[in-house]
């Protein structure tokens, strides 16, 4: 802090109300005696900007307001920092989950296990906490029992400490006079609970609404997205990611000008419309070692930031009849509102199909992996299970993720994920497989009793060879089975009676399935 001259020290130590002066940059004058303790505290408060950053503000003597008046010019380029306490996150629980069937036959999409011990809902939830956002709404609809249970155990029942934050689960419900109670789209899901959000706003200083999806894998500081939203004074900001030719038509694609303003939005274009959305991405700083030419499109991630009042106006008045953000509201809103793009160049994967789910899990086993759950600064949270370490006896393990609480006995595991708490017996070979694990332990005595009764214990049995498979929770199989003998074969018939389905060349063993001895697929 600098002073232009020595100030006279007269009068009692006191502070008078702030009044405007005639200095440049909209300066403010604060009348204060320079020898007081209050002066030191007041000047320190005024000369330090948000988040503890030291300001370049100067206190100078003016000639038109008396000898004891200090002028504090506001810095013309001072940044208006976004406050996480002014942000509320809304996580969409997804629809019927047909693309991820049969994994969603008994659970909602965000409740699908990933990475050995996590659920998909843990991704946006953890990103929120790591970003300092702790006011979260989760909107659920289909098969929500396991999702509600996981949220309660992890985030409400003694798992994560939120301090002054909150997590609220909002289940789809019918209101009086409504014929269709289910959500008709992403925007309709938020609209159905506008009354909850409005009531929340009456008591909380929420200025921005962050809309998130519950079926993606990525690590993001959401406050960087919100900060750009604030810096651009945007009404809506879309988080976007570069994508390649093969998957571009699966997403909503955007074009934006040099200022970052979105000028064109096309939802899942095909043919000539797809070619029209191609852009030059050479200006982007890719976090992964990729060439810009491999990613000539910019896709919307389904992550949006809205000004609170803008969102309420769009859903209640302006577009009250429209149901989806991506295909309906955003293409219209960009002509009437300041819609900005935030380009995210780190790892991002949309878990929308069985193939993308399988590939995303297998990518975690690569060396080096494209995505890491392991980061002490931004960890991912999940339900605390209090399991012991994995026990491994004479096993061969290569490029694999083994979760806690597993029993591995004389088996071989390569490029696979083994979930909690799994059991693999002697002679078992696991390759290119996602094994989700089990809900409970079976002791050695319980296993012996089940075998004596002719029943099948939970786990993978002796001399079983499994490759290119997804094995759901609590699967029971014991001796000499071979799954997916011909890797990549996609025309094999489903076996619903045996609770085995094939999707995109991947064998999916359904939850709680029992596989008979000698089964070959």
Curated annotation (Swiss-Prot):
Activated by 3'phosphoglycerate, inhibited by orthophosphate. Allosteric regulation. Pfam families: LbH_GLGC, NTP_transferase. It comes from the Eukaryota. InterPro entries: ADP-Glc_PPase, ADP_Glu_pyroP_CS, NTP_transferase_dom, Nucleotide-diphossugar_trans, Trimer_LpxA-like_sf. The keyword ATP-binding applies. It is found in: Plastid, Chloroplast; Plastid, Amyloplast. CDD domains: ADP_Glucose_PP, LbH_G1P_AT_C. The keyword Transit peptide applies. Residues 1-47 form a transit peptide. Coiled coil: none annotated. Abundant in the embryo and is also present in the endosperm. Keywords: Allosteric enzyme, Amyloplast, ATP-binding, Chloroplast, Nucleotide-binding, Nucleotidyltransferase, Plastid, Starch biosynthesis, Transferase, Transit peptide. Its EC number is 2.7.7.27. Transmembrane segments: none annotated. One of its GO terms (molecular function) is ATP binding. It catalyses: alpha-D-glucose 1-phosphate + ATP + H(+) = ADP-alpha-D-glucose + diphosphate. Heterotetramer. This protein plays a role in synthesis of starch. It catalyzes the synthesis of the activated glycosyl donor, ADP-glucose from Glc-1-P and ATP. This is Glucose-1-phosphate adenylyltransferase large subunit 2, chloroplastic/amyloplastic. It comes from Zea mays. The lineage of its organism: Eukaryota, Viridiplantae, Streptophyta, Embryophyta, Tracheophyta.
């Amino acid at each position: 802090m600098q002073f232009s001259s020595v100030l006279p020290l007269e009068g009692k130590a006191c502070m008078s109300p702030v009044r405007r002066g005639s200095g440049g940059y909209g300066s403010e004058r604060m009348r204060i005696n320079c020898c007081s303790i209050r002066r030191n505290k007041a000047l320190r408060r005024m000369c330090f900007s948000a988040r503890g950053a030291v300001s370049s503000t100067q206190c100078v003597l003016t000639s038109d307001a008396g000898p004891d008046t200090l002028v504090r010019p506001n810095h013309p380029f001072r940044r208006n920092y976004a406050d996480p306490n002014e942000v509320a996150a809304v996580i969409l629980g997804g629809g019927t989950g047909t693309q991820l069937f049969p994994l969603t036959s008994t659970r909602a999409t965000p409740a699908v296990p990933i990475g050995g011990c996590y659920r998909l809902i843990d991704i946006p939830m953890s990103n929120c906490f790591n970003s300092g956002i702790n006011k979260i709404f989760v909107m659920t609809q289909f098969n929500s029992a396991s999702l509600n249970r996981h949220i309660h155990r992890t985030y409400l029942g003694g798992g994560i400490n939120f301090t002054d934050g909150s997590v609220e689960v909002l289940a789809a419900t019918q209101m009086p006079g409504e014929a269709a109670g289910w959500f008709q789209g992403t925007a309709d899901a938020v609209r159905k609970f506008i009354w909850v959000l409005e009531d929340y706003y009456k008591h909380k200083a929420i200025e921005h609404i962050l809309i998130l999806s519950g079926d993606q894998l990525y690590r993001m500081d959401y406050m960087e997205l919100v900060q750009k939203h604030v810096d651009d004074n945007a009404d809506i900001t879309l988080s976007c990611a570069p994508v390649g030719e093969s998957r571009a038509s699966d997403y909503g694609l955007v074009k934006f000008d040099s200022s970052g303003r979105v000028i064109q939005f096309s939802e899942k274009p095909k043919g000539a419309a797809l070619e029209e959305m191609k852009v030059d991405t050479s200006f982007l700083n890719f976090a992964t070692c990729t060439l810009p030419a491999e990613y000539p499109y910019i896709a919307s991630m389904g992550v949006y930031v809205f000004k609170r009042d803008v969102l309420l106006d769009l859903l209640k008045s302006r577009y009250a009849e429209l149901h989806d953000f991506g295909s309906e509201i955003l293409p219209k809103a960009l002509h009437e509102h300041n819609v900005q793009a935030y380009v995210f160049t780190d790892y991002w994967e949309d878990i929308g199909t069985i193939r993308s789910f399988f590939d995303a899990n297998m990518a975690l086993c690569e060396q080096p992996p494209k995505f890491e759950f392991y980061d002490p600064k931004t960890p991912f949270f999940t339900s605390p299970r209090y399991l012991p370490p994995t026990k491994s006896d004479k096993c061969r393990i290569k490029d694999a993720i083994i979760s806690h609480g597993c029993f591995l006995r004389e088996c071989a595991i390569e490029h696979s994920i083994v979930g909690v708490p799994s059991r693999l017996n002697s002679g078992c070979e696991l390759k290119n497989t996602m094994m989700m694990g089990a809900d409970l332990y079976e002791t050695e005595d319980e296993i012996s009793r089940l075998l004596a009764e002719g029943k099948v214990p939970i786990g993978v049995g002796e001399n079983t060879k499994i490759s290119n498979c997804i094995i759901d929770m609590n699967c029971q199989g014991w001796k000499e089975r071979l799954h997916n003998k011909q890797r990549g074969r996609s025309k094999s018939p489903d076996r619903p009676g045996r609770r085995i389905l094939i999707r995109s060349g991947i064998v999916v063993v359904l939850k709680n399935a029992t596989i008979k001895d000698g089964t070959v697929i």
